[in-house]
């Protein structure tokens, strides 16, 4: 097995296979559930809008893969600073049956100098998730924060407020996951001494098996080989799956773009 093939197999089991499109339907989400149960193994999770969770739960159960987790998004995609709305959306997502919630950090407030609202928003969403045994991922939107000091600060605030994962991006802005932002964020996890309890999720722009290999190499280098398991590392992606399957001998290499 080549290094690329091994990385492709590993990456497949770390995917949050995602559809977050305005034209999503129950049928499209059910098709996503089928894709998540691939010929080379199943993904860690799917990531969908909250209203589709019941249809996804039923589809995953009926196809015999109830262990594929269901992630959803809240305060998405704009990362507004209204804590009550973010909390209400998070509670609603939990009520729909989410296993994991990816909440958008109020990154514009941080850029404007307000660190407190982000801490409080994540803290309150974490309390709701903790009570329901739901994993909380915090999207800091690195492509909008841009500056290394802001990316580090948002990561630190999210972790201090209780994030189970820190995630790069919504996939809805011009610049999404990059290796540079990934290095900054995983270095914060290492430097804060929270590698046992906090994970990392690059999202948006991870499209090929080669891309996945580079992120996994980075994780191995910063946090140690073996750290990047499904409890500590996820890829938020859609088009990546076809590239991984092609690398593993299942189908042709895809063309075009995708999340």
From Swiss-Prot:
Highest taxon of source: Bacteria
Main location: cytoplasm
The protein's Enzyme Commission number: 4.1.2.4
Enzyme class name: lyase
SUPFAM superfamilies cross-referenced by the UniProt entry: Aldolase (SSF51569)
GO cellular component terms, semicolon-separated: cytoplasm
Record Pfam families: DeoC
UniProt subcellular location: Cytoplasm
GO BP: 2-deoxyribose 1-phosphate catabolic process; carbohydrate catabolic process; deoxyribonucleotide catabolic process
Keywords recorded for this protein, A-Z: Cytoplasm, Lyase, Schiff base
Reactions the enzyme catalyzes: 2-deoxy-D-ribose 5-phosphate = D-glyceraldehyde 3-phosphate + acetaldehyde
Transmembrane segments: none
Annotated pathway: Carbohydrate degradation; 2-deoxy-D-ribose 1-phosphate degradation; D-glyceraldehyde 3-phosphate and acetaldehyde from 2-deoxy-alpha-D-ribose 1-phosphate: step 2/2
MF term (GO), any: deoxyribose-phosphate aldolase activity
Active-site residue list: 102, 167, 201
Similarity-based family: Belongs to the DeoC/FbaB aldolase family. DeoC type 2 subfamily.
Purpose: Catalyzes a reversible aldol reaction between acetaldehyde and D-glyceraldehyde 3-phosphate to generate 2-deoxy-D-ribose 5-phosphate.
Name of protein: Deoxyribose-phosphate aldolase
